[in-house]
Amino acid sequence: MSFIAIIPARYASTRLPGKPLADIHGKPMVVHVMERARESGASRVIVATDHPAVAEAVKAAGGEVCMTRADHNSGTERLAEVIEHYGFADDEIIVNVQGDEPLIPPVIVRQVAENLAGSQAGMATLAVPIESAEEAFNPNAVKVVMDAQGYALYFSRATIPWDRERFAQSKESIGDSLLRHIGIYAYRAGFVRRYVTWAPSQLEQIELLEQLRVLWYGEKIHVAVAKAMPTVGVDTQEDLQRVRDSIKG
C-alpha cells in the first residue's frame, strides 16, 4: 500500500521559537521527524514549511520540501496547499505527521494509513486508552467515542462516555472505557480539498477541536487504538530536554 507523509513545520512558535530547528543531538527536530516518517514505509515524505531556514535544514539532510504560505490557520490548510501544489490525485492517501513529534513510532504512521485504506471514511486517526483519573478529567486530553464499526461519534474535552454509576461512587476508578485521541491523521487528498471549503462549525468553535468540523458536515472519521504508545510532542524547552534525554538514553 502506498501513502505520502507530509510534515507541517511552521517556524513560529510562541513558547519555543524556531521549534523545527531545535537541536537534538546534532540534528534539527524536523529531521528526526522526517527520519521517523521514512521508517514507516511512506512512498514519499514531504516537509511543508513557511521558512527558508527550515527548508535548508531539510534539504541538507536529503529531504523534500514544499514552501507554503505563513498565514494558514491550521495544519490541514497547509496540507491542502501542498496537495494542490503537487496535484495529488483525489484517492491519494496522505498522512499528516506532526512536526514536533521527533519520537513518533513509525508503526502508527503506517497504521493510520492502512486503516484509512480499509475504510469508507475520508479521514482516519488513532486513540490510546486512558489509564489515570488525572488524564480522564483533564480538558487538554481530548476524548473520543466510536460506533460499532470504529467510526467516531464525537470528540470532546469533556469526559466521555460519562460512567454515571462508577463516577457517582468515585472518580479515582475510571474503568477501561475511556480513549484519548492522538493527533495523527490520514486523509484522502480529495477529502482535504472538500474540507477546506467548509466554514468552521459551531461545535468546533466551542470545543476548539478542528476535527469536529468533519462530523458536523456528516463525514466519517475512522478511529482505532494505536499499536504503539505515542510520545508527547515538543511545546516547551522542558519537553525538548525530555526528548534529548530519551534519545540519548
Swiss-Prot record:
Pfam families: CTP_transf_3
Record-linked InterPro entries: Cytidylyl_trans, KdsB, Nucleotide-diphossugar_trans
Enzyme class (EC, first level): transferase
Function text: Activates KDO (a required 8-carbon sugar) for incorporation into bacterial lipopolysaccharide in Gram-negative bacteria.
Signal sequence bounds: none
Alphabetical keyword list: Cytoplasm, Lipopolysaccharide biosynthesis, Nucleotidyltransferase, Transferase
Pathway assigned in UniProt: Nucleotide-sugar biosynthesis; CMP-3-deoxy-D-manno-octulosonate biosynthesis; CMP-3-deoxy-D-manno-octulosonate from 3-deoxy-D-manno-octulosonate and CTP: step 1/1; Bacterial outer membrane biogenesis; lipopolysaccharide biosynthesis
GO MF entries: 3-deoxy-manno-octulosonate cytidylyltransferase activity
Disulfide pairings: none
Gene Ontology biological-process annotations: CMP-keto-3-deoxy-D-manno-octulosonic acid biosynthetic process; lipopolysaccharide biosynthetic process
Annotated compartments: Cytoplasm
Family the UniProt entry places it in: Belongs to the KdsB family.
Taxonomic lineage from the root: Bacteria, Pseudomonadati, Pseudomonadota, Gammaproteobacteria, Enterobacterales
Reaction equation(s) it catalyzes: 3-deoxy-alpha-D-manno-oct-2-ulosonate + CTP = CMP-3-deoxy-beta-D-manno-octulosonate + diphosphate
EC number in record: 2.7.7.38
One term under GO cellular component: cytosol
Protein name in UniProt: 3-deoxy-manno-octulosonate cytidylyltransferase
